[in-house]
Amino acid sequence: MRQSAFLSLLAFVASAAAAPAQAQRLPRYFISVDMEGIGGIGTPAMTSANGKDYELGRKLMTGEVNAVVGAILQRGPAEILVNDSHGDMQNLLHTELDPRVTYIQGAVKPFGMVEGLDSTFAAAFFLGYHSRAGTPNGFIAQTGTGAVKGLWLNDIEVGEGELNAAYAGSVGVPVIMAAGDSAFVEQFTRTVKVEAVATKYAVTPQSARLLHPKVVQERLTAAAGRALANRSSAKPWVIGKPVKVRLRLSDNTVTQILQAIPGVRQVDGFTVEFTAPTMADAYRLIRLMYRFVSV
């Protein structure tokens, strides 16, 4: 073999061997997408599989994900994992998602809205989120399920956004952008400092003042770009450990049953609490309780 050919072969082998390592070094981003806070959705029916205009809601949801994905990839190659986080978690139009992402679908998963998120991710994005249960002007305000009236982590009242941010923080991942209705943005950014986009303006829990979807998606793209530009200064939201969890429910019969779980204590007729050694342990048990009270 001629020397030049031999050197070319060596260069090819070296580049082939380096390719997997280079792929592994790509930044990884996690997107959790709920539905109530998606722009253009102004009635609860649009978030339900049997509701009027649900298919339009799915299309709007998919469009917002693609807007953020486009902003991420405009800055360079990246790995992006999208986790459907609403209801049965089978809402996004998979065939209309940007083909460069991977997608988790289905509700039976240990970590629900943050399934797949671990310490290998550079940052997380929360899209389509809503405010916590009891928020007076929050559009479809709830915390996990309608049966939950309040959730506290280490004496801090949280909604789904803060709960998921606390989990992300426990694995060292900062949330750098969040989007949802105006009540969610106002509430979430009090606790977690992120680039935020109000996709609509909550009027009541059943109605909202909407922006055109194109306007919302343009704002999401711009906000994602700013969030990525400032990523180096972002810090995970960490609540520490152990994690004391307090859950207030609407049904006092349920609290009687939940206290039978080892480590769970009934505080009053509607409230139970427990202490978990880690945020992951706390999250799993909260998920179990949600599933139980939603039956």
Please give the residue ranges for each predicted region.
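Bacterial N-terminal signal peptides
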Residues: 7-16
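Boundary at the C-terminal end of the N-terminal hydrophobic targeting segment
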Residues: 18-23
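Mature N-terminal segment immediately following signal peptide/propeptide cleavage
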Residues: 24-44
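Short catalytic helix/loop segments, enriched in acidic residues and glycine
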Residues: 47-67
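C-terminal accessory domains and tails appended to enzymatic cores
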Residues: 80, 216, 223-295
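A glycine-rich helix N-cap at a beta->alpha junction
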Residues: 99-117
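Active-site glycine-rich loop that binds ribose-phosphate moieties when present
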Residues: 145-171, 177-180
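Active-site rim beta-loop-alpha module in soluble metabolic enzymes
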Residues: 167-175, 179-225
